[in-house]
Structures are given as structure tokens and as C-alpha cells.
Curated annotation (Swiss-Prot):
It comes from Prosthecochloris aestuarii (strain DSM 271 / SK 413). Mg(2+) 2 binds at residues 113, 116, 278. Binds 2 magnesium ions per subunit. Belongs to the FBPase class 1 family. One of its GO terms (cellular component) is cytosol. Pathway: Carbohydrate biosynthesis; Calvin cycle. The gene is fbp. Its EC number is 3.1.3.11. Its main location: cytoplasm. This is Fructose-1,6-bisphosphatase class 1.
Length: 332
């Protein structure tokens, strides 16, 4: 683009188009962008800074924690929490909610996955940060509790992700379209590079771990087989593209068209991805870009959460592809 627009300037211009805006959400998003810069700085030099490998602990999910997971989690909590703009925070790495300092004026809730796909970081595969912002449901920030976090995804006021790859991009929505910013390390700024992102109605790729095919139910297997069949009218067969890093797989399909599938399995009948930290924010972005997201039977953004670390199956991507997946799930 000829006109260089920083992410801060973009947020301000968006704010001006809403006379009722107080500027609080603009400040929150700027805080998130700043935290992303801190995480990016360490991700790109992880092999030199002795923060690769395992930390020797497990998180609330029962998963081994990487050193970089802990670093990213700590940086985001410290960079964002100290400004007093959030009444409460929740991280995939923390069992309970996080009460930020100076939260007595916070009017928002932040939920985030500090480093999605971190199991790939040791082999230099793209990883990402995912975030979701809600309004406080009550009037007193000091009385904020877990119930303020357990809102439907349709109540999100903003969501986004940062992908740390060959370049670093931040993609976000506030319900007014989806915009992407690429980090320019020479000036230390995120610059608008992808305005009003839309995803194709039908894609040509599917992303799923077919190594777990024996764990899938028949309807999921039938859907995958359908995508592999020859049919010129619907652009089949589809090609497989699976990285194993949710942000990277989702981002590629968002830009090129396709469907990401992480279904229920025999080992995880309720799914494995986290509703609040992964599925909800990506579903908000996907729908704003013209796509669709479901658990196979219900729209992701309509699910009533009952737990902070609740899991869900996920079918997300191009609208026609997800609708077809739902057809197979309903038949099954």
C-alpha cells in the first residue's frame, strides 16, 4: 500500500467513526498490540535466548508447558494488566481468573491464549497469540468474577490473533469487518496491510490431523472422504494443508478459503480446543470475514459456556464448506 497507516492511527480513525466511543477500547487494543511486540521480540530469538524447550511443569489442561509459553503469558499479563483497563483476565495457562492491579476502573474482560501452537516453536513453525475482549457485566469492577468471563461468544466486543511466522501479522475485529496489520521491524510498528479481509464462500483446502482418523466418528470420516472425491462442479478434490498450529492453519484458510476441522474423538468426546480462548475469538473473526464456525451442530458463538476452560469440537472456515460439514454431522 502507498499510504502507511499504523495500527494506532487505524484504531483512532475507527474510533472517530463512532461518536459515542469513549476511547477505552482503542486503548485496550493498543495494549494488546504492544504486548504482541514483546512476545514477537522473544519468539524470533528464542533459540538464542535459552527459552526453547520444556519448563518442567504442566498447565491446567494437563499439558507440558514450554518455557516460551510461560514467558508469553507473563509478558501479556504484565504489559496489559498494569494499566487498569481490565477488571479481570483469563489465560489458557492459568487455572483461575487473574485479577490485574488497579482494576477498580476496568470495564472489560480479557481472555487469551498466550502462545498457541507452542509445541512447534522448537522446529521454527509459526505460532500465535489469540485474544478475546468482553464488557464487564456488572457495574463494579471490584466485584468481577468468573461469571463475567462466561459469556457467549456473540457478546465479544473485539477479538483477534497475532501470527508469528515469516512475517508477524495482527488480525482483529470489533464487529465492523476484519483488518490485518503486518509488523515492520525497521520502524517497530504494525502497518495496515490487509483491509476488510473477506474469506471465499467455498475453499479448496481442508485442515485436519488425519493421523487421528481412527478416532473420528463416522460422520467426520464421511465428510473428509467427500472432500477427497472428484467433482469439478464443487472444486473437489480438496487439497490437505495441516500445520498443527491452529492460528497458522486458520489464517491460511481465512485468506485462501478452506475449512479447519478439529472434531470430537473417542479420546476427547467433547472436543479438545478451548471454547473461550480459541474457538470463540476465531469464530468471531471468521463470521465477520463472511465465514462460518460451528461445533458440528451449533453455532460456536451461541454456545453458553459453563467452564473457563471448556472444550469444543470446531469446524471453521469458508461458509459453504462448514455448512457441508454440518450436513454430514446431522446425518451421522
Amino acid at each position: 500500500m502507498n499510504k502507511l497507516i499504523t495500527i494506532e492511527r487505524h484504531f483512532l480513525e475507527q474510533q472517530k467513526s463512532h461518536p459515542e466511543a469513549t476511547g477505552e477500547l482503542t486503548d485496550l487494543l493498543n495494549d494488546v498490540a504492544f504486548a504482541a511486540k514483546l512476545v514477537r521480540r522473544e519468539v524470533v530469538r528464542a533459540g538464542l535466548a535459552d527459552i526453547l524447550g520444556m519448563a518442567g511443569t504442566t498447565n491446567v489442561q494437563g499439558e507440558e508447558v514450554k518455557k516460551l509459553d510461560l514467558f508469553a503469558n507473563e509478558k501479556i499479563i504484565n504489559a496489559i494488566g498494569e494499566h487498569g483497563r481490565f477488571a479481570l483476565m483469563g489465560s489458557e495457562e492459568n487455572e483461575g481468573t487473574i485479577i490485574p492491579p488497579n482494576n477498580d476502573t476496568g470495564r472489560y474482560i480479557l481472555l487469551f491464549d498466550p502462545l498457541d501452537g507452542s509445541s512447534n516453536i522448537d522446529v521454527n513453525v509459526s505460532v500465535g497469540t489469540i485474544f478475546s475482549i468482553y464488557r464487564l457485566t456488572g457495574d463494579d469492577p471490584k466485584e468481577a468474577d468468573i461469571n463475567d468471563c462466561l459469556q457467549k461468544g456473540s457478546e465479544q466486543v473485539a477479538a483477534g490473533y497475532v501470527i508469528y511466522g515469516s512475517s508477524v501479522m495482527m488480525v482483529y475485529t470489533t464487529g465492523q469487518g476484519v483488518h490485518g496489520f503486518t509488523y515492520d521491524p525497521t520502524i517497530g510498528e504494525f502497518l495496515l496491510s490487509h483491509e476488510n479481509i473477506t474469506t471465499p464462500e467455498r475453499g479448496k483446502y481442508y485442515s485436519i490431523n488425519e493421523g487421528s482418523l481412527h478416532q473420528f466418528n463416522d460422520s467426520t470420516v464421511n465428510f473428509i472422504n467427500y472432500l477427497k472425491e472428484d467433482d469439478e462442479a464443487t472444486g473437489r478434490p480438496y487439497s490437505t494443508r495441516y500445520i498443527g498450529s491452529l492460528v497458522a492453519d486458520f489464517h491460511r484458510n481465512l485468506m485462501t478459503g478452506g475449512v479447519f476441522v478439529y472434531p470430537a474423538t473417542k479420546g476427547h468426546p467433547n472436543g479438545k480446543l478451548r471454547l473461550m480462548y480459541e474457538a470463540n475469538p476465531l469464530a468471531f473473526i471468521c463470521e465477520q470475514a463472511g465465514g462460518r464456525a460451528t461445533n458440528g451442530k451449533e453455532r460456536i458463538l451461541d454456545i453458553n459456556p459453563t467452564e473457563l476452560h471448556q472444550r469444543t469440537p470446531l469446524y471453521i472456515g469458508s461458509k459453504e464448506d462448514v455448512l457441508k460439514a454440518e450436513e454430514f454431522e446431522k446425518e451421522g
